[in-house]
Amino acid sequence: MVLSQKLHEAFKGTVERITGPRTISAFKEKGVLSVSEFVLAGDNLVSKCPTWSWESGDASKRKPYLPSDKQFLITRNVPCLRRAASVAEDYEAAGGEVLVDDEDNDGWLATHGKPKDKGKEEDNLPSMDALDINEKNTIQSIPTYFGGEEDDDIPDMEEFDEADNVVENDPATLQSTYLVAHEPDDDNILRTRTYDLSITYDKYYQTPRVWLTGYDESRMLLQPELVMEDVSQDHARKTVTIEDHPHLPGKHASVHPCRHGAVMKKIIDVLMSRGVEPEVDKYLFLFLKFMASVIPTIEYDYTMDFDLGSSST
């Protein structure tokens, strides 16, 4: 951790200790949440997405302003099938990256495009119009194919004398070589990782905060530095930091919340301009949707099929 980050965390911790949590809603005005709104949004996420659950965490680290059994949200064993760098070109080709906030070159990607791998394969598929289908190539009917009604041509197994029909020198029985299956080169195997994702309430920034705990294919804990391989290169080392988890032991990679409120405010403004009145209990669905641009290959559940809010039209 660099000195500036250490100083900021020390300052942030001091402010959190001497100030109380937000109690007045500023969801639409600032894109932030009060503690009660965070719990409300968390309850809705758990209800709509059963893979998410509330956790109490380490008793010594519990925050008094949160319910003891609802200290943070977590979803476990989330698959990550490939590294973030492998899809960067796909996103660019799909033209799906849109900066929600690009002030001071600190923008966030609102969404991302779809991979184009399948499209390439489809380009190589022949058209049905190009196939020359004629009557001569059609499959014969079953009776004709197997000899029709001419049963007399089919030999009777009872006519075979086993002693006279044994082939003693069948080449197939003398085959001395056989095929051996070899494992592919390890360098060509894409290792599937899994992640535990947790969401905490950041009292200083008054927004949710995502934390990542990664595991390799053998369920061995990933070093936080390796987690960066599964973070969009636009955000790795810039908006993703390695810090102490507020409720769990050890260092964890985390998406820093310094811009969360501003980004959420812009998303809310866009929805309202389209005649949709966002509801605060849907906050985490929107939040996790824009988080997908930071960790595009970690396939967590945030339920795309949901009502963003009540339409004013």
From Swiss-Prot:
One of its GO terms (molecular function) is ubiquitin-like protein transferase activity. The keyword Cytoplasm applies. Its main location: cytoplasm. GO terms for cellular component: cytoplasm. Residues 103-125 are annotated as: Disordered. The active site is at C258. Coiled coil: none annotated. It is found in: Cytoplasm. Gene3D superfamilies: 3.30.1460.50. The keyword Cytoplasm applies. One of its GO terms (biological process) is autophagy. Keywords: Autophagy, Cytoplasm, Protein transport, Transport, Ubl conjugation pathway. It comes from the Eukaryota. Residues 114-123 have a biased composition (Basic and acidic residues). Belongs to the ATG3 family. E2 conjugating enzyme responsible for the E2-like covalent binding of phosphatidylethanolamine to the C-terminal Gly of ATG8. This step is required for the membrane association of ATG8. The formation of the ATG8-phosphatidylethanolamine conjugate is essential for autophagy and for the cytoplasm to vacuole transport (Cvt). Interacts with ATG8 through an intermediate thioester bond between Cys-258 and the C-terminal Gly of ATG8. Also interacts with the C-terminal region of the E1-like ATG7 enzyme. This is Autophagy-related protein 3. It comes from Arabidopsis thaliana (Mouse-ear cress). The gene is ATG3.
